[in-house]
Amino acid sequence: LNLVTKLEELMVVGYPFEVPAEYSSLPQLLGRATVAIETNKGDLQVVVDGYSAPVNAGNFVDLVKRGFYDGLDFNRAEDFYILQAGDPPGEANGFIDPKTNKYRAIPMEVLVKGDDLPVYGETLEELGRYLDQPVIPFNSYGAIALARPGDDPNGGSSQFFFFKFDTEVTPPGYNLMDGRYSVFGYLTEGKEVLEELTAGDKIISAKVIEGIENLKEPE
């Protein structure tokens, strides 16, 4: 996957679209970045894809840069196929921006194959696009997506989850997950570590090791 990522980056000239102005107050990743995550059971490496989900990817890279995830537990493991982290201590369920003292809410964002720019604010199901396929689907092991309240596609913040491939839930072509969550990256190293991680395990540290120059800070 790393080699494929490098080749794809060489093929991209400039950034292919403009993120809607209404999201200018949020970090954006205008390209790709690589994040190394050290856990108590070993190391993971992920590629964060701002070409497919610049706002969700930018939010994640910004929080990694801040050290937000360092020391946080994996707080949820469901049916052996979801592993979630990013819930901070205290009452807040996400990131409270110190500049505004408000919860940073991140929009639903998914780029569909054949579209020029992502869909924002609604799930593909809500839009009636049931069979459309996202550029980054859930049917590859270790896809990373933004966790969110079940009734609010725009209510996610800092919590994210790894999706451990499950053929019953994510068959090729159409599945129950694609288009319902914002996928912003994928695992490139550490599959055997991800398989062992569960609720109660810990992120020791997360660091951006490549692509930080692609992070655009909020205006």
Q: Which residue stretches match the model-derived regions?
A:
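Cross-family detector of peptidyl-prolyl cis-trans isomerase
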Residues: 1-219
